[in-house]
Structure formats: structure tokens, C-alpha cells
């Protein structure tokens, strides 16, 4: 019996509900004739216990396999010989297919355009897919999200048409392969790309980032990353929020980056313990949020007096925990001249707000924040302001 798109779904539904009845009507699932099927998207969606041999299915006319095995927690069958030459969409295909780990290295992916979320939470998967043809793929976001064991060479992939690689290796804890030759000239979103990619430390300094607008959390918790990315073009980037958050080893010269369009640098170097580079030439004229930018970046003590903060509305704890941290007793190594340049005389109220919100006016080891006016008199506050301006 030849099945089409509609009858195949009916057959699968019956198989999951009553296997014996499905065999009576359609035969065993392993022998179904799927030669006329073009759409297998979501075919086994949420079939948590499905794990039958379907290796002989004819998929030569299938164009869509998106979400096919989504949430099939136990599925782990050999489907490596499937004909995928006409498939264009395989996004979410193995989403939450925790146990899937089969050889699909020979799949023809030349017509695939969307690989987003393909191995999302596919914990067991670690197969060689380095020879896949990805020349037509435009979306790879979250492709290996939480693919905890994946660490294969995919350095030769053609990524020339890819526009989105956000979250691609997020939580891919062991991934550490050379992808430095990837063509990224069309990529616009790199946010969270290596978020929690603990082992990744490869040279990606030659990437073309001229069209990227979002680099937020790109190296968040990328503990080992410390590569030269000084030549990246960042003139179109608007979001650098948490970019190097807890990137413990990172300490590279990025002082020549063009940051004129960036609006958020909040938590950018938060907990980046080793970072201590000169960024005094950065153009921060459009930045509105620098809260916790250098929070607990313990080694940072660079002169940032040239940074423009005229549009900044949030400086909460911008350098708290660094060598620049202010103490009321004056025993820190903070350079007062930096603050004098940052805040003009007519902005002394803003300066006080900056001190308080940033935690720079401690009282017996505690940040004053909203309670500062209850501890200091108006005269004391005035003295504090004038001592730095």
C-alpha cells in the first residue's frame, strides 16, 4: 500500500495508539511504502517511546523533515541510508531526541536551507557530519544547543549564505574544533554563539563580522576562550550585552573596535577576571546602558576617562569589584581624574547618582544605594561630590 502525506500521518497515529491494528491495516512500520510522501515534518512529534526500524523508508521525494523526531526521547535507529537529496528543511529534526546517535554522515544536504535547532538537546549525538553540503543553509541558530557530547570537525562547512548562528554552540560543553575558515560575511546575529561552550578556544580572528548587529553573550561562560579577535569589524554591532561575561581567560587587545552604534555594554566584562586592555578609544556616544560593565573584572584598571557617557542612563556597578573601585576612605587606587573627565561640574548630581548606583560609596562595607541619604547629611554629600569634581 502506497502512502501519501495524509495516510502516512494516519498510519503513524494508529501505530502509536494500537500497533496490532496498524499492522492489520498498513503492515509493519518498517515496510511502509513512503515513496509518494513529500512531507514528514512533525511525523513522530512527541512520540516519546518510538524506536522502530524505519531504515528502509523511501524518502526520495521528501522535502520537509522539520521536527520529524522532535521529543522522541528513545529513538535511536539507523537512518543513515535515507535519500535526503530533495530535503530543504531539517530544523528541529532531532530536537530533544536525547538518545539519538547514529551515523548520518552520507546524507545529501545540498538543498537544505534551514538547520536551526536540528540537534537541540540531542545529548548523545557525536557523529561525523563534516562532509555535509551546507552551501544553501541560511539558518544555523541553536543547531547544537546542549549537544553536550558533540565535538566533530565541521571546519570545512560552507557557511557563505548563513545569516544566523546565534546560540549555535550554546551549552555544547566539549566542542573545540577549528572553524576559523568559516565564511561569515552574511551573518547578522552571533549572540550566545559560544555561551557555556566551556572548552572552545579556537582562532576565529579572520571571521568577517561586518554585518553582525548582535554579539550579546557571545562568549558568556566561554571559560577557555582567549584568541585574537582584534580585527573584527564591529561597526554595525548594537548589542554587546554580557559579551565576555565570565570569559575567565580572555585578555586580548580589542581597543580598535568600532563601537559607535553600540547601545548596550551592560555586563560586557562582568567576571572577566583577566581582562585588562586599553579601550579608551572606543566610541560610546550611543551607549545607554553600562551597568556592571566591568563588575568583578578584578584585574581591570585602565583609564576610561575618554569614554563618552552622555546618553548613559544606567551605570549601576559599572566598575564595582575592579581595581578602579572607589572607597570613601580614599584608600583605593582609583584615579579621581578619570571621574573628573567623565562628569562635568554641571552634572554633579548625575555623578552622585553614578557613585551610589555603582556601589562606589560603601558604608561599613555595604553599598548605600537608595539608603545613602539616610546615612550622609547634605553637607557630607556635597563634600563627596566636590572631592571628585
Residue ranges and their predicted role:
Residues 1-389:
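Negatively charged
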Amino acid at each position: 500500500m502506497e502512502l501519501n502525506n495524509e495516510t502516512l500521518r494516519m498510519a503513524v497515529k494508529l501505530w502509536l495508539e494500537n500497533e496490532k491494528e496498524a499492522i492489520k491495516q498498513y503492515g509493519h512500520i518498517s515496510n511502509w511504502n513512503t515513496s509518494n510522501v513529500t512531507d514528514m515534518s512533525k511525523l513522530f512529534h512527541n512520540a516519546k517511546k518510538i524506536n522502530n526500524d524505519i531504515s528502509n523508508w523511501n524518502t526520495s521525494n521528501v522535502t520537509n523533515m522539520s521536527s520529524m523526531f522532535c521529543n522522541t526521547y528513545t529513538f535511536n535507529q539507523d537512518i543513515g541510508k535515507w535519500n535526503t537529496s530533495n530535503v530543504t528543511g531539517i530544523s528541529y529534526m532531532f530536537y530533544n531526541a536525547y538518545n539519538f546517535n547514529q551515523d548520518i554522515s552520507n546524507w545529501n544536504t545540498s538543498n537544505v536551507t534551514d538547520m536551526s535547532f536540528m540537534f537541540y538537546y540531542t545529548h548523545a549525538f557525536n557523529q561525523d557530519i563534516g562532509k555535509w553540503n551546507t552551501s544553501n543553509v541560511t539558518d544555523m541558530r541553536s543547531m547544537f544547543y546542549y549537544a553536550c557530547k558533540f565535538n566533530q570537525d565541521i571546519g570545512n562547512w560552507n557557511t557563505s549564505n548563513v545569516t544566523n548562528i546565534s546560540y549555535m554552540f550554546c551549552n555544547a560543553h566539549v566542542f573545540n574544533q577549528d572553524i576559523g575558515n568559516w565564511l561569515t560575511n552574511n551573518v547578522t546575529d552571533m549572540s550566545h554563539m559560544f555561551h557555556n561552550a566551556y572548552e572552545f578556544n579556537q582562532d576565529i580572528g579572520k571571521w568577517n563580522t561586518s554585518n553582525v548587529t548582535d554579539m550579546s553573550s557571545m562568549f558568556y561562560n566561554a571559560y577557555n576562550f582567549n584568541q585574537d579577535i582584534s580585527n573584527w569589524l564591529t561597526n554595525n554591532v548594537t548589542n554587546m550585552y554580557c559579551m565576555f561575561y565570565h570569559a575567565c581567560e580572555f585578555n586580548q587587545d580589542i581597543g580598535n573596535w568600532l563601537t559607535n552604534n553600540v547601545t548596550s555594554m551592560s555586563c560586557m566584562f562582568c567576571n572577566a577576571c583577566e581582562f585588562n586592555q586599553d579601550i579608551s578609544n572606543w566610541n560610546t556616544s550611543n551607549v545607554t546602558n553600562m551597568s556592571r560593565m566591568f563588575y568583578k573584572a578584578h584585574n581591570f584598571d585602565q583609564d576610561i576617562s575618554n569614554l563618552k557617557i552622555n546618553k548613559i542612563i544606567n551605570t549601576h556597578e559599572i566598575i564595582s569589584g575592579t581595581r578602579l573601585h572607589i572607597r570613601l576612605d580614599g584608600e583605593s587606587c582609583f584615579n579621581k581624574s578619570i571621574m573628573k573627565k567623565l562628569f562635568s561640574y554641571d552634572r554633579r548630581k548625575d555623578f552622585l547618582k553614578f557613585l551610589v548606583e555603582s556601589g562606589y560609596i560603601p558604608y561599613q562595607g555595604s553599598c548605600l544605594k537608595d539608603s545613602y541619604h539616610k546615612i550622609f547629611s547634605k553637607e557630607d554629600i556635597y563634600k563627596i561630590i566636590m572631592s571628585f569634581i
